Amino acid sequence: MLMSTTPYFGEVSKRRTFAIISHPDAGKTTITEKVLLFGRAIQVAGTVKGRGSNQHAKSDWMEMEKERGISVTTSVMQFPYGDCLVNLLDTPGHEDFSEDTYRTLTAVDSCLMVIDAAKGVEDRTRKLMEVTRLRDTPIVTFMNKLDREIRDPMELMDEVENELKIACSPITWPIGCGKEFKGVYHIHRDETILYTSGQGHTIQEERIIKGLDNPELDQAVGANLAAQLREELELVLGASHEFDRELFLQGELTPVFFGTALGNFGVDHMLDGLTQWAPSPMPRQAAERVVEASEEKFTGFVFKIQANMDPKHRDRIAFVRIVSGTYKQGMKMNHVRLGKQVNISDAVTFMAGDRARAEEAFAGDIIGLHNHGTIQIGDTFTQGETLKFTGIPNFAPELFRRIRLRDPLKQKQLLKGLVQLSEEGAVQVFRPLQNNDLIVGAVGVLQFDVVVSRLKSEYNVEAIYEGVNVATARWVECDDVKKFEEFKRKNQSNLALDGGDNLAYIAPTMVNLNLAQERSPEVKFRATREH
């Protein structure tokens, strides 16, 4: 953990870096808005829904996201809250972008899980929780949409415990729901916070009633709801877990908050808990050793590359999570994979699509480095030491298409666009060794649409897809050079290079893949590859 002797101890200890995970439509983008609003980072929280209107959620900033009202790429937003400085990483809400989300989860120290209280635990939430469990990431839970009719709150907590295998500790408890929603009782503060709906960027003054037995409570919410609240709380406090910060930090227990993001209610209670309990920047495993956040020398790793954040400049930004030390404008860094010293004078910080030049940044912060094709996902930057941070994955795609040009003269731009998009992890590109085809591989169908729309808007290339006889791909490697050469000679027609020039086996059927593996037991066929 952080040592208080560190010169920049105060800066690092106030950092909280977290991501929001949820099922699509559970209200994640609205929560992102309102978190920024309560952090006073956005003066007007624009609604996401009005697809025809000009107000788009601050974090959904690419053209296609604006059209469809879904967040497809990860945005980074930094804002102060209380005594803390919060780095919020917004992850794609659409299931096709699980890879991008997965990689983002390697760059955070905690997560906020948003659940639609009318629906409960949904499929995407299950998958994302599996990912957070690999690193025992601490989870804070927000039960959203209390201004609608919801499921029984006790049932919701049981479902989280049974399906997601994490103990629940309620911090606030709802009083009614839908039209009858009156507010929440804050168990830790022994006070009732009454609901008055705030819309857009208005945060209403909260009326607070101290104590559960206060007669004012009965007057404010009605005798029936007050009696129901006292009865429920007796049950809840008897049956649920007390909050234990150690268990929370181990990813075994989640504090649960209730509210409505759309009505600007409950988000601040959750933020209070998150900033109070979530960890400041954590140590991180490199292949060589564990790196502590309190170390003075700079280290960081690239978890995402985003092309064309500024269409005027055709640029690419590499998102770097700082693990230790301080970034200062103009400092020299070692780009470990290339073994090259680089001078970084123009790193940027983010406020969801708005960029500012970073003069300094600390462990836990995310900075953006301008990338002219030399930086890849998974790259490590240090102040001299040779380190490689581990655990940033690439997945074998499950869907494939051949990509064709409407104008054959634009082959060069097409290849450039595809390689750049594959470097940022939006899609994977395979170039078969035996022909000039370009095969695009994705984890979900939406990725194909994104690629065609971005090729058109960013590279001025009109492309179309055709079906291709590919069922799956595996990266191949072998320690025995001679046997590998023989394997390559025999399987020439099934081999391709990906965007990073790694050799992959392209199988027309799963049966074909199984046969190839049986025939060449010494060759490793990998479904995931570390960046």
UniProtKB/Swiss-Prot annotation:
Domain of life: Bacteria
Domain tr-type G: 13-282
InterPro entries membership: EF-G-like_DII, EFG_III/V, G_TR_CS, P-loop_NTPase, PrfC, RF3_C, RF3_dom_3_sf, RF3_GTP-bd
Disulfide cysteine pairs (residue numbers): none
GO biological processes: regulation of translational termination
An annotated GO cellular component: cytosol
Chief location category: cytoplasm
GO molecular function: GTP binding; GTPase activity; guanosine tetraphosphate binding; translation release factor activity, codon nonspecific; translation release factor activity, codon specific
Protein name: Peptide chain release factor 3
Role summary: Increases the formation of ribosomal termination complexes and stimulates activities of RF-1 and RF-2. It binds guanine nucleotides and has strong preference for UGA stop codons. It may interact directly with the ribosome. The stimulation of RF-1 and RF-2 is significantly reduced by GTP and GDP, but not by GMP.
